[in-house]
Structure formats: C-alpha cells, structure tokens
Amino acid sequence: MMISNKAELDKCREAAVEELQSYGCRILVCSGTGCIATGSEKIYQKMMEIVGNTPNVTIEFAPHDEKEHVGVKRTGCQGFCEFGPLVRIQKGDKVVQYIKVQPDDCQEIFDNTVMGDGLVDRLLYKKAENTYVQPDEIPFIAKQTRVVLGKLRQI
C-alpha cells in the first residue's frame, strides 16, 4: 500500500491502533542486541510454542473470532539491557516488565500474567525495598527520554 498524503497516513495509523487494541494481551520480547546475546530468541520461540499449544487461544495478526487473542512480538531495545532478556506483558492499560527471563519461566508467565491477573514476583525488578511492576516506574527507565525512537519498546 502506497501512502501519498497525511490523511492516508492518519487512516493507517488509526487502523493500526484499532488492531492493537483488539488483542487481549501482547507478549513483547526484547530483541535488542543485549537481550539477543542473553537468549531472548529462545524466550520468543518458547512463548510462541506455549501460546500455539493452548486451547481457545490463537496467535493471529488480525483477530476475527471469539477466541482469546495473544500477540507474541519481538521488539526493539526496551532500555534495560543489564537485566535482559526482558519481556513485557501488555493487557489493556496494564503493562508488566519482567527481567532476566529464561525459557523455563515462560509457562509461569503465561499462566499467571497472560491468562490470569497474577505476577511472577521473582522476575520483577527490585531495588532497595521497592518492587517495580510497570516499566515506567523503574527509576532508570523513567529517566529516559526517547525522542526519535520513542515507540521502539513496543514495535
């Protein structure tokens, strides 16, 4: 599709936002160089396997039926490389950031956070006496201002 003016671009953007909102949940696996070096591709493959083998859950680019739709996606750098591999779970307005995820953690993340409303506490970032669930609450990430690549963590 060729976009030739701003109105067409705005229409494409609105369609993309509507499509993203149709997912019940998005699993975002960091594929920045640091996370790839620490094994994020294995995390991605394991999540795809788990979602693909779960009854009444489907992975599709364009949801169109009554099943629960879960998107599994590689993203650009999520900005917290020291603690990779990183996985974010987006359900509506709720975002959970998991750190140092290993393939053996994927089923627990899927069962507790994707299919339920729970957390995997040991995979959350902790500093001093604080536990951080949402990525924007983590002090290091909260101080980052991404101007050009602001949406890289989501796309």
Placement of each model-derived feature along the sequence:
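Feature of Fe-S/electron-transfer and energy-metabolism proteins
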Residues: M1-I155
